[in-house]
A protein has these predicted regions:
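Non-catalytic helical/linker scaffolds that mediate oligomerization, partner binding
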Residues: 1-251
Length: 251
């Protein structure tokens, strides 16, 4: 964690599809201790599972699910609030109603939550289904931030449409001044290899040039062989993309 922070990690995401509360609590403590040693603040995102079914090692939306927020999510939310996590991210949102339901659940557990506009936790919507794309503007309006989960989205729409969905979501988030994280398989090859592919580097740069506020690693840092190298590559590409933007804007 010390090395990840030193090489460019700004936010940590905890995937509540996996792991025990005991393991998550230890990881939260370790993240905060490492951030303190570095003189940094590292916000933590609690990524709720949502209505998933598992096939082998992958998860996807349960099509029979009526409610996006499950009983497991509510138990996980209680844990996240007890740990004072900075962001709660709801998976598989389809409309503003799903986001508002999560906010209501937070308010029910902490009546003072609504009284402070700057208070945590912030509510993040994960966009990863066609219905969310159809309702993207109302979802952004209802959320404090958005995460684009391209993996599950690519199962719900034709995969060739994913880059254009990404551009559309980022555009609307920038227009409405809401932070947007682009996620999934950004440096997938670095799970097993110390260097990225040219296509992966281009993918990261594309997201930044579109206007994404953050790009996210998952497997690369959760179970990959080269987590620090992956963060280092991502940091370098982001800085180059931002430099390019400044040069273009100066013309």
């Amino acid at each position: 964690l010390d090395a990840l922070i030193a090489h460019g990690m700004d936010v940590a995401r905890l995937n509540f599809s996996h792991g025990s509360y005991e393991n998550h609590a230890l990881l939260i403590k370790n993240i905060r201790d490492a951030a303190k040693r570095a003189g940094r603040t590292i916000p933590i995102i609690q990524d709720l599972s949502g209505p998933r079914v598992q096939e082998g090692t992958s998860h996807h939306l349960d099509p029979s699910a009526v409610e996006v927020i499950t009983e497991k999510d509510l138990k996980d939310l209680d844990f996240g609030l007890s740990q004072q996590l900075e962001y709660i991210c709801q998976s598989f949102v389809g409309s503003a109603k799903d986001v508002e339901q999560l906010r209501s659940e937070i308010f029910a557990r902490n009546p003072d939550y609504k009284l402070q506009a700057t208070s945590f936790p912030k509510v993040m919507a994960k966009v990863e289904r066609k219905e969310a794309l159809d309702n993207i503007e109302e979802i952004i309006d209802a959320s404090d931030a958005v995460m684009l989960g391209r993996g599950d989205l690519g199962k719900d729409i034709p995969i060739e449409q994913v880059p254009f969905a990404e551009a559309m979501v980022v555009h609307h988030c920038k227009e409405k001044k809401k932070p947007i994280i682009v996620a999934t398989e950004m440096l997938k090859s670095m799970v097993d290899n110390p260097e990225p592919t040219r296509a992966e580097v281009t993918d990261i740069a594309y997201a930044i040039i579109l206007g994404a506020d953050a790009v996210m690693l998952s497997e690369e840092t959760a179970r990959g062989k080269y987590p620090v190298e992956a963060v280092t590559v991502m940091e370098k590409v982001c800085l180059e993309a931002e430099k390019f933007e400044r040069e273009v804007n100066a013309l």
